[in-house]
Amino acid sequence: MKPAGATLNLLTLDIEDWRQLIRLRFTGEVCSPGREVVGETNALLQAMADLNVHATFFVLANVAVTFPELVRLIHQQGHEIASHGYSHERIYRQKPEQFRAETRKAKSLLEDITGAPVLGYRAAEFSITAQSWWALDVLSEEGFAYDSSVFPIAGRRYGVPNALLAPNRIHTRSGNAIWEFPLTAVELWKHRLPVGGGGYFRLTPYGLTRLALQRVNQQGRPAVVYLHPYEFAEEKLEIALPRLSLRQRLILVRYSWLHNFGRRRLCARFRRLLGEFGFLSVRDWLHKKGDSL
């Protein structure tokens, strides 16, 4: 049961196809997403409809190209459509010109499908870091009102350890301004720990996640929860890739194990989370704050 007057948190879903991204990562092969992403997303939509919860869907544009009807369905059910880029290439591996072109293309595609402005962006693998901070200028110049790519932790592949923990308005190096909605972390013994998203949500006992989110709300900030449709897949996530080296095969085994762990209980855990905490989309949070978009 949600307490009256509880802090409203932000529910975000990254719409991407697991097998497509694994192929890209391990072989460099660019292929179309599988139809599994449609069924997995529909299961998420049903869970949210049952509890009257709306979210922000960060849609990878190559999923939208293949399944535009899925994007329309999400939009028609009252959820926010935001951009997850086009190719799922990490930003710090791109040049600014390449990033701008891809970002503009993805934004235009999603707006053409829904007929509504796309306000938000999330980078592949949270790849807005100190190395790619310039991307915030590009996003602001391309008409985005907010970003949700910064993980305020010291991670191996991502993270900005000195970033603010709460949503904040960033003034970029070129004098532009854009809202940042960092992924959720809590401070414990001078360390920042990620909570409430993806593998962190699946691998952490639910009771600890609940305590962490309660602590975040007690500090007056909303939690930014993120999940992926493939985490709700009924079948095991696995893929056979030929011509991998032994090292690559071992890495793939580790990836598969991490992405499969905790999935069987995830749907029940997700519904419990939605029942115990208040959630809304980033767009609606900004509207409630009175920000003109």
Predicted regions and their residues:
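Active-site-adjacent pocket scaffolds in enzyme catalytic domains
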Residues: K2, L21, A116-P117, A123-Y226
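Active-site beta->alpha N-cap acidic-glycine motif
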Residues: K2-Q77
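Short, glycine/acidic-enriched loop or turn micro-motifs at the edges of active sites
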Residues: D17, S87, E231
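Generic structural signal for well-ordered alpha-helices
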Residues: T41-L45, P68-R72, R100-K107, L136, ...
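C-terminal domain-boundary segment and adjacent tail
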Residues: D50-L51, L203-L293
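Metal-dependent polysaccharide deacetylase catalytic core of the NodB/CE4 family, i.e.
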Residues: L51-S132, F144, S149-R156, G175-A177, ...
